[in-house]
Amino acid sequence: MAGALSLRCRTGCTGGCEYGHKGKCRDSSLLSKRLSEDSSRHQLLQKWTSMWRSTSEDASVADTEKARLEEAAAAAEERPLVFLCSGCRRPLGDSLSWVTSQEDTNCILLRCVSCNVSVDKEQKLSKREKENGCILETLHCTGCSLNLGYVYRCTPKNLDYKRDLFCLNVEAVESYVLGSSEKQIVSEDKELFNLESRVEIEKSLKQMEDVLQALQMKLWEVESKLSFATCKS
């Protein structure tokens, strides 16, 4: 009898255990419940961890892409400028010899220029405001003879930083960023339409139109003959 009661207690005593196993059974039930709760919490924790890792990976990818774009933008900003003559687009110099720019005189100052810039040896005094005492030599483009600006040969003490610098008028200069061109060679199967191809296409369309008109006339003649034969019969 005792063995049977003991067996009943092991298999699931509720509240009427007569042999002192009531507390043990309750402890077992609480333990199972806590284990179940811990398992649920563990699963939830794993789920959150997975979501966090996914979010972190997405953020890492986004940060990597952002860094790449910032590097590309920085590289674009560091690309040198080539200054071209606005008349014939010959290169006059580049930003590697850049010194400064002056908004009041609307010009840029370079340490050196290309061989496309000729210097007139005839010297003259500057007539610009605040440049009294400056001796200038005129700059011209060797290609189109456009007046590009001046080179300062003699300056007062307060303008010593301009001496032997080439002052190019902004209106006479255009700029080009090295590496900014994205033009690619077009393959034969993707060749763009030009004037000759357009003429050929228009010619082919005209021939097709003439053929269609001739077929329409023949069809009209056949229909007329059939209609006449029907009326006669």
From Swiss-Prot:
This is Protein Mis18-alpha. Transmembrane segments: none annotated. Residues 80-178 form the Mis18 domain. Keywords: Cell cycle, Cell division, Centromere, Chromosome, Isopeptide bond, Metal-binding, Mitosis, Nucleus, Phosphoprotein, Ubl conjugation, Zinc. It comes from the Eukaryota. Zn(2+) binds at C85, C88, C141, C144. Required for recruitment of CENPA to centromeres and normal chromosome segregation during mitosis. It holds the Pfam family Yippee-Mis18. GO terms for cellular component: chromatin; chromosome, centromeric region; nucleus.
